[in-house]
């Protein structure tokens, strides 16, 4: 399946929650009514979604949130299932460790899509080496930095300014002046994605 390139607000309305696909400069909450699905008539009143439908919807929501397509998402699940511990929590930890997501969490990109583009365009380094693979898995202690020739890009400067106003997650440490940061640790489950019910995804793939 190709990556969705249409209106971002429509995806958040479809999932009934903000997927953080738009910059915080223009809150998607101002444009999307999350209790109404896209379309002329919106959500059908009184309609009950099946268990399978709920599970599928949750998977779609997380895929769209992190910008991951089905084949790759399935691989993440299989890896999460092989690891010790809770499969659902492992899945989210893998998604959070993607380089594009870490770049977003550090505030170098105002959205995950923008962060993915920065990585793909070789604007970022990991431990001093250029990495242009958005799915690259960042490890605790890795240093992420904007390449010197990209530091003055307006979108990066503006994204960092916005991130400093909003606040950074506890698991990253940023030096905005140098446009670099450290991925201190993979976050615990209770530190992120509070509106994600990963157990539904586990149930779906366990069918």
UniProtKB/Swiss-Prot annotation:
Pfam families per record = Ribosomal_S4 (PF00163), S4 (PF01479)
Signal sequence residues: none
Keywords from UniProt, A to Z, are: Ribonucleoprotein, Ribosomal protein, RNA-binding, rRNA-binding
Pinpoint the S4 RNA-binding domain residues: 97-160
Q: Where on the tree of life does the source sit, at the highest rank? A: Bacteria
GO molecular function annotations of the record? rRNA binding; structural constituent of ribosome
The GO biological-process annotations, alphabetized, read as: ribosomal small subunit biogenesis; translation
User: Mind telling me which InterPro entries this protein's record contains?
Assistant: Ribosomal_uS4, Ribosomal_uS4_bac-type, Ribosomal_uS4_CS, Ribosomal_uS4_N, S4_RNA-bd, S4_RNA-bd_sf
Annotated stretches, region: Disordered: 31-53
- Cellular component GO terms held in the UniProt record: small ribosomal subunit
NCBIfam families named in the record: PRK05327.1, rpsD_bact
Q: What does this protein do?
A: One of the primary rRNA binding proteins, it binds directly to 16S rRNA where it nucleates assembly of the body of the 30S subunit.
Q: How does it assemble?
A: Part of the 30S ribosomal subunit. Contacts protein S5. The interaction surface between S4 and S5 is involved in control of translational fidelity.
User: What family does the entry list?
Assistant: Belongs to the universal ribosomal protein uS4 family.
- Please identify the protein, giving its name as recorded: Small ribosomal subunit protein uS4
Task: State the species of origin.
Answer: Albidiferax ferrireducens (strain ATCC BAA-621 / DSM 15236 / T118)
Which gene is transcribed and translated to give this protein?
A: rpsD
């Amino acid at each position: 399946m190709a990556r969705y390139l249409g209106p971002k607000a429509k995806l958040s309305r479809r999932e009934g929650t903000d997927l953080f696909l738009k910059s915080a400069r223009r809150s998607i909450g101002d444009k999307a009514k999350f209790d109404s699905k896209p379309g002329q008539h919106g959500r059908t009143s009184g309609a009950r979604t099946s268990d399978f439908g709920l599970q599928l919807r949750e998977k779609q929501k997380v895929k769209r949130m992190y910008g991951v397509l089905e084949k790759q998402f399935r691989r993440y699940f299989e890896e999460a299932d092989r690891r010790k511990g809770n499969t659902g929590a492992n899945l989210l930890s893998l998604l959070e460790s993607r380089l594009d997501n870490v770049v977003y969490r550090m505030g170098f990109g105002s959205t995950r899509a923008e962060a993915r583009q920065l990585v793909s365009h070789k604007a970022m380094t990991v431990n001093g080496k250029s990495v242009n693979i958005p799915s690259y898995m960042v490890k605790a202690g890795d240093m992420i930095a904007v390449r010197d020739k990209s530091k003055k890009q307006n979108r990066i400067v503006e994204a960092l300014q916005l991130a400093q106003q909003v606040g950074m997650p506890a698991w990253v440490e940023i030096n905005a002046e140098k446009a670099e940061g450290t991925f201190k640790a993979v976050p615990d489950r209770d530190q992120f994605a509070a509106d994600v019910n990963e157990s539904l995804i586990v149930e779906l793939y366990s069918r």
